[in-house]
Regions:
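Polyanion-engaging groove/track-forming segments
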Residues: 1-182
């Protein structure tokens, strides 16, 4: 048999994207962009409806950092609508639930890394992913891929997670107590 393996890199995998988004948020990057990127990785314990509602709300209202930390209360359809329909209320609830989960996790992460060294930052990023449900979501994704595309594809998805987590471990090992500016 002829095997034609394609070289792959975890650089653009969901785990790497999630870690990059978290690090960008720690550096003070735009919350709207990075929180929606994080939500769309599929590694947060959010339903597809919650992710869509969050992204639509963020697109409609362009919340600043302060607005992300406050409860979402505006009509998901925008300025022109006064009365909330049942669908609007549901979308608002989904967006608010997603906002709260993401912002709470990121704010906890910020508190843990403030003035921290490389080891503390690596550990805090891992535990933030864990708080967001990333391990369970990744395991579910691997099983879905196994059922749809077979064992080799599932093993590749699992490898992507393992490589990114190993990179966090190596950062902690190599830099240890060194101060790192995120």
């Amino acid at each position: 048999p002829l095997d034609c393996d394609e070289p792959t890199t975890p650089e653009f995998s969901a785990p790497a994207t999630a870690v990059r988004a978290l690090l960008a948020l720690l550096r003070g990057a735009d919350m709207t962009e990075q929180l929606t990127v994080l939500a769309k990785t599929g590694l947060c314990a959010l339903s597809e409806e919650q992710v869509c509602a969050l992204e639509n709300y963020a697109y409609t209202w362009s919340p600043n950092a302060a607005a992300w930390r406050a409860e979402f209360t505006k009509n998901p359809k925008g300025f022109g609508e006064n009365e909330l329909t049942d669908e609007d209320r549901q979308n608002l609830a989904w967006a608010e639930d997603a906002r709260r989960k993401l912002v709470d996790a990121v704010d906890t992460l910020r508190g843990k890394v403030k003035g921290g060294n490389a080891e503390q930052i690596s550990r805090a990023v891992y535990f933030c992913l864990k708080e967001l449900g990333a391990e369970e979501q990744q395991a579910g994704l691997v099983e879905d891929i196994r059922a749809a595309r077979g064992i080799p594809a599932a093993e590749e998805a699992a490898r992507e997670w393992n490589v990114v987590m190993q990179l966090l471990d190596e950062m902690a090992s190599l830099l240890g107590q060194q101060s790192v500016t995120v």
